[in-house]
């Protein structure tokens, strides 16, 4: 198991991080602040797993890496998972794959391999796709959007076996 990085996350673009009960709350400094995020203080290259145990109070728990983004409880359609490809920024909408029960903790794992990525929520694969992620180096982040507050109790980065 990798180190829990919640104590080391850096606020970005209006992000306010509040420590509370063994977790952190992440909010934007303004009601509709777009892309506020708590950023890891390190650069990651594929293959790795970006794992968050988190919850949202309403909408928009977002995870980012390079040009990629995962959007759970999207404000336009809370049940649709939005996946933006880290290499191309191509957007995918997956019906009935994006809902997280507000107020409940969820384990989200974003596995980024050299040539594919998967999104796993509470043990269920919600996205599996191909791409070339071999040349990307970027810092992962997690945050809210459009007035939501996201809480995170675990934020880990784990190297993956390239054969996986």
List each language-model region with its residue ranges:
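Short tryptophan-centered beta-strand motifs in secreted/extracellular beta-sheet-rich domains
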Residues: 50-52, 103-121
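Secretory/extracellular carbohydrate-interaction modules
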Residues: 25-85
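Ligand-recognition surfaces built from glycine- and aromatic
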Residues: 134-164
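Short, solvent-exposed beta-strand-to-loop segments that form ligand-recognition rims
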Residues: 120-141
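Short, aromatic/His-centered strand-loop micro-motif at the edge of beta-sheets
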Residues: 86-107
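Short, exposed beta-strand/loop patches in secreted or surface proteins that constitute
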Residues: 14-19, 70-76, 110, 132
